[in-house]
Design a protein with these regions (language model features):
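Feature marks short, surface-exposed loop/turn motifs that line or immediately flank catalytic pockets
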Residues: 34-36, 60, 129-131
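HotDog/MaoC-like acyl-thioester-processing domains
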Residues: 85-87, 91, 95-133
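Hydrophobic beta-strand-centered segment that forms part of the acyl-chain substrate-binding groove
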Residues: 59-91, 96
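A generic structural signal for short beta-strands and their flanking turns/coil linkers
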Residues: 12-14, 24-26, 71-77, 88, ...
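Extreme N-terminal tail/first-helix region
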Residues: 1-11
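Catalytic strand-loop segment that frames the active site of acyl-thioester-processing enzymes
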Residues: 15-44
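Hydrophobic residues in beta-strands and at strand termini
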Residues: 30-32, 81, 129
Length: 133
């Protein structure tokens, strides 16, 4: 999905990489950068970076159900931080749980590449879809 990596300035600035996309699912990677640190003495990434990745991944997963001219916008988001995210790449995986005509509900899981089976955060994203009519 070149749109995600190349055509959205914020995504390009963050360096987000699409690893896998299929209907109702997305897996994105956020390469580690020192400026993503939240607490350098603890070696932990900033929670806002984790939330940003969750939001983007959730939107991408939902967007797979719609056309290229439809717009997906987050209206509600909850992120539970389960443990500190170490200084390493983050991997986000999003699964669409409900895809309606105008609303989507997505579950997102974030892990570090150093321990891919252990979530550092989980969240729920609710999005509004504005369909191109």
């Amino acid at each position: 999905m070149p749109f995600v990596e190349q055509h959205v300035d914020w995504h390009r600035h963050l360096g987000i990489k699409v690893e896998e996309v299929r209907t109702g699912y997305a897996r994105l990677r956020l390469p580690f950068r020192e400026e993503f640190a939240g607490n350098k003495s603890r070696g932990a990434l900033h929670g806002g970076v984790i939330s940003t990745l969750a939001d983007i991944c959730g939107n991408v997963a939902l967007w797979t159900h719609f056309g290229p001219n439809d717009m997906v916008s987050t209206v509600d988001m909850r992120v539970d931080f389960l443990r500190p995210a170490p200084f390493a790449d983050l991997i986000a995986e999003a699964d669409v749980r409900l895809q309606g005509y105008r609303i989507g509900n997505i579950f997102v899981r974030i892990a570090s590449e150093t321990a891919p089976g252990v979530a550092v955060a989980e969240g729920r994203i609710v999005c509004y879809v504005k369909r191109a009519e």
